[in-house]
């Protein structure tokens, strides 16, 4: 049987993805306000 990806690893990757997206969003808005 093909080895499946552990559920906890999927959760960690999803969490990191969300944190990265939120970080880029807040950083972009902060940089935009600072440049304005």
Swiss-Prot record:
- UniProt similarity note: Belongs to the PsbJ family.
Q: Which PANTHER family match?
A: PHOTOSYSTEM II REACTION CENTER PROTEIN J
GO CC, alphabetical: photosystem II; photosystem II reaction center; plasma membrane
Q: List the disulfide bonds.
A: none
- Report TM segments: 5-25
Q: What is its main location?
A: membrane
Q: How does it assemble?
A: PSII is composed of 1 copy each of membrane proteins PsbA, PsbB, PsbC, PsbD, PsbE, PsbF, PsbH, PsbI, PsbJ, PsbK, PsbL, PsbM, PsbT, PsbX, Psb30/Ycf12, peripheral proteins PsbO, CyanoQ (PsbQ), PsbU, PsbV and a large number of cofactors. It forms dimeric complexes.
Which example biological process does GO assign this protein?
photosynthesis
Keywords associated with the record: Cell inner membrane, Cell membrane, Membrane, Photosynthesis, Photosystem II, Reaction center, Transmembrane, Transmembrane helix
Topology relative to the membrane, per the entry?
Answer: Single-pass membrane protein
Organism of this sequence: Gloeobacter violaceus (strain ATCC 29082 / PCC 7421)
Keyword rRNA-binding set for record: no
Where it sits in the cell: the answer is: Cell inner membrane
**Gene that this sequence comes from:** psbJ
Q: What does the record give as the function of this protein?
A: One of the components of the core complex of photosystem II (PSII). PSII is a light-driven water:plastoquinone oxidoreductase that uses light energy to abstract electrons from H(2)O, generating O(2) and a proton gradient subsequently used for ATP formation. It consists of a core antenna complex that captures photons, and an electron transfer chain that converts photonic excitation into a charge separation.
Q: Which Pfam families match?
A: PsbJ
Record-given protein name: Photosystem II reaction center protein J
